[in-house]
């Protein structure tokens, strides 16, 4: 296969082995899932987004989201907020923690975030973006990045200009989800805007949106020239996507999808990691959504999802998966 892009690259001084990035997703990219994705070949991991204000209040639940394991490196910590001075202070206060890159969320479409002027609401105010990125990047020595969407309904957002502002303000890279805030995750991602941003800035551009297979990753690179490929919803229940993309981009060959035995073992390993981190009660309950994702589209998956909601411990989960095999 022709070489589409460099496999090894950098964000600031941080070396990254391949361009395949786990997107930050609330309720998904916690510590256990990030480790599983790393083992399958993710080049860069991103934490769940954490509130700068909650960090400043030493909120216990927020602090727990910031836990990082040494095996994860390189890993990006994503924060969100709208107050430049507070965000800079928080960035400085957490810099000694073992993350490699600090990312600023400017794309979250969720109402409770947007209504606070945070996440994608920042797109309405380019000068506030400039102030936030400038102050945060000056406050820390680690590379600072930003993740944006390409528009906000009712406002004349110019995503290319915003990317330029982010670059000029000291960011080391920008990730672009090719959808507006109004779209959430509906419709097709606008890869052409990602291409225009890539042509307009000199920092690395990470493309995000609609990449759910090695072939789609290839298409994104061909259409945009992006430096990194960020995978979000398609990785839920599918950490193998990183293995498949690495293999395809280096050999041109498509790997077979994981067998049921591989899926079963991944579910059980994931469950053990969740239990170790959060205890059996919480760990097993948090696995329910992951089980739905792991088994989506499989025969008997509807019954398995239903039955998994009744499981309360690891032994019951193991038995349920064994029964599923025998159906």
Predicted regions and their residues:
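Alpha/beta catalytic cores of nucleotide-metabolism and tRNA/nucleoside-modifying enzymes
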Residues: 1-8, 12, 16, 20, ...
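Aromatic- and acidic-residue-enriched carbohydrate-binding clefts of CAZyme catalytic domains
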Residues: 123
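Alpha/beta enzyme core
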Residues: 39, 88-118, 127-203
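Hydrophobic faces of well-ordered beta-strands that scaffold small-molecule active sites
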Residues: 20-24, 45-47, 75-79, 102, ...
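Active-site beta-loop-alpha junctions enriched in small/polar residues
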Residues: 25, 50-52, 80-82, 107-109, ...
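N-terminal small/glycine-rich loop or linker at the start of catalytic domains
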Residues: 9-21, 55-75, 108, 113-116, ...
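Glycine-rich, positively charged N-terminal anion/phosphate-binding segment
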Residues: 2-10, 25-100
């Amino acid at each position: 296969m022709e070489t589409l892009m460099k496999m090894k690259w950098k964000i600031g001084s941080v070396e990254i082995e391949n361009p395949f990035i786990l997107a930050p997703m609330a309720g998904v990219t916690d510590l256990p899932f990030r480790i599983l994705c790393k083992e399958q070949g993710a080049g860069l991991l991103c934490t769940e987004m954490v509130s700068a204000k909650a960090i400043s209040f030493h909120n216990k639940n927020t602090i727990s989201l910031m836990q990082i394991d040494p095996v994860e490196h390189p890993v990006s910590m994503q924060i969100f907020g709208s107050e430049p001075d507070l965000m800079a202070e928080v960035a400085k206060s957490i810099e000694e923690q073992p993350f490699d890159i600090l990312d600023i969320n400017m794309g979250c479409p969720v109402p409770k975030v947007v209504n606070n002027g945070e996440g994608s609401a920042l797109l309405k105010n380019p000068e506030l973006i400039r102030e936030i990125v400038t102050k945060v990047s000056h406050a820390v020595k680690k590379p600072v990045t930003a993740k944006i969407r390409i528009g906000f309904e009712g406002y004349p957002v110019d995503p290319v200009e915003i990317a330029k502002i982010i670059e000029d303000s000291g960011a080391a890279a920008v990730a672009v989800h090719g959808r507006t805030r109004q779209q959430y995750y509906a419709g097709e991602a606008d890869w052409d805007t990602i291409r225009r941003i890539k042509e307009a800035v000199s920092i690395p551009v990470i493309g995000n949106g609609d990449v759910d297979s090695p072939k789609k990753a290839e298409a994104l690179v061909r259409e945009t020239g992006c430096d990194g490929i960020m995978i979000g919803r398609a990785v839920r229940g599918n950490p193998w996507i990183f293995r498949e993309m690495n293999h395809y981009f280096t050999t041109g060959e498509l790997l077979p999808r994981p067998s049921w035995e591989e899926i079963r073992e991944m579910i059980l390993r994931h469950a053990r990691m969740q239990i170790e981190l959060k205890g059996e009660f919480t760990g097993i309950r948090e696995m329910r959504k992951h089980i739905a994702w792991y088994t989506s589209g499989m025969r008997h998956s509807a019954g398995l999802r239903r039955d998994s909601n009744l499981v309360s411990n690891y032994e019951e989960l193991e038995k349920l998966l064994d029964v599923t095999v025998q159906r």
